[in-house]
Amino acid sequence: MLVMACDLVVAADNAAFCDNTIDLGVCGTEFFNHPYDFGSRKAKELLFTAGWLSAQEAAATGFVNRVVPLAELEASTLNMASVIAAKPRFALKMAKEAINAAHDAMGRPQAMSTIFALHQLCHSHNMQVYGMPVSTFEIKKP
């Protein structure tokens, strides 16, 4: 999910999120933040089932910062951006670095490196088994 690479997320109340990479025969995306965003059990549930997460559920897990009515999405996002833009830039950068350092201390760089290697291994496996880097439901399992 592209949203995982975002520092802040404002979602419309009708938004839904899904990571269906397992359905494509791949064990996750190149940017893999699932355990950090959801915790291990919820990450496994979402990946193993390719289940959908409503905007409200995403907010409850901390995956999105705010949920607003669709009609207010742009205004709410611009408001948040202007509040942040008015802050001292260096202090913002240092706050972001501190938060990222905390994640790094929890092993995120090693996890990212490992998942990228496993992701590529899945592509290699699919090339050998299916003749393409991703699989589809129509392909019969060997």
PLM features per residue range, with description:
Residues 54-55, 75, 79-82, 86-142:
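C-terminal alpha-helix plus adjacent terminal tail
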Residues 1-92:
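Crotonase-fold acyl-CoA enzyme core
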